[in-house]
Design a protein with these regions (language model features):
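Glycan-recognition and catalytic cores of secretory/periplasmic carbohydrate-active enzymes
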Residues: 1-196
Length: 196
């Protein structure tokens, strides 16, 4: 919601929408990320990632609205979220969850053991966050993550023959992927897959 209100501000120029974007920024996550504290253990991953996308949009538009304090805080929150997820909670191909949740930051074994590996929706939204951060500060680290996640996760999520989409990409040895059945399965990653 914070991203939607930030976009409404950009379209209208009315600061009430930027204020609403701030009010819809989940304080529990925002304050911890702003303060450099990773509290993502066992949290639903794709509930948190879009919040951080919104933080980045609020930061970007706060600069235009000449609200430098907001810009600094929201940039710090978005950047720390990106940094902790990409450095501490992502696999080599860019995926970052198992069973839709961030595991404990020291629980790497669950990535390999679990048949429900990283969700493509998370990676898609992390790419959206990466794009926003790159617009403000074009660092190579953003481009490196984007390339890795796009080529190794996102582009592999659509079935090459029937066009179905993948929900989870397991990291288990000798495991398989389940693709959606065209016109039948409409889970979240099918919709995100179409956006990819």
């Amino acid at each position: 919601m914070n991203e939607v209100f930030a976009d409404a501000y950009q379209i209208s120029g009315d600061t009430k929408y930027l204020d609403a974007a701030k009010r819809f920024s989940h304080k529990w996550l925002f304050e911890s990320m702003r303060d450099g504290k990773d509290n993502l253990d066992n949290k639903h991953a794709n509930t948190q990632v879009p919040k951080a996308v919104g933080y980045q949009r609020v930061a970007e538009l706060s600069v235009q609205a000449k609200r430098s304090g907001d810009a600094v805080d929201y940039t710090r929150a978005a950047y720390f979220f990106w940094q902790t997820v990409t450095a501490n909670r992502s696999l080599a191909f860019g995926g970052n969850s198992r069973r839709e949740h961030f595991p404990d930051d020291a629980d790497y074994l669950s990535y390999v053991d679990d048949r429900e590996g990283p969700e493509s929706c998370n990676t898609y939204n992390m790419l959206r966050l990466t794009e926003g951060l790159f617009r403000k500060d074009p660092k190579a680290a953003y481009a490196d993550f984007y390339e890795r996640a796009l080529f190794n996760h996102i582009l592999s999520t659509q079935h090459p023959v029937h066009g179905g989409y993948v929900y989870f990409t397991p990291a288990r040895p000798a495991h398989y992927r389940v693709y959606s059945a065209p016109n039948e399965a409409m889970w979240c990653c099918v919709g995100t897959g179409m956006e990819n």
